[in-house]
């Protein structure tokens, strides 16, 4: 498999620009499933609302699992001080 830097940049830009605050990941999950399916994987949505993907390896002697989060930091700017410092609060 060759690494396509342009595909990587375009895909990263696409997913990084999807709003996905904690508890509201439906939009990013939909896009991730579409992208993974386009790559030939079978991605599904679990009952808990997570994207699941199984990749069969060359050997069944070892099993590897990994996970990642897709939600973004849910903060709101409360005020901006005179020196440019941000005062934030949780959303």
What does each model-identified segment do?
Residues 1-91:
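N-terminal hydrophobic/helix-forming segments and targeting peptides
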């Amino acid at each position: 498999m060759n690494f396509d830097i342009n595909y990587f940049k375009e895909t990263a830009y696409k997913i990084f620009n999807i709003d996905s605050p904690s508890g509201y990941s439906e939009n990013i999950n939909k896009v991730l499933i579409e992208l993974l399916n386009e790559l030939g994987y079978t991605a599904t949505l679990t009952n808990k609302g997570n994207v699941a993907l199984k990749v069969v390896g060359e050997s069944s002697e070892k099993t590897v699992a990994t996970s990642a989060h897709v939600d973004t930091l849910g903060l709101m700017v409360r005020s901006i001080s005179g020196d440019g410092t941000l005062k934030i609060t949780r959303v």
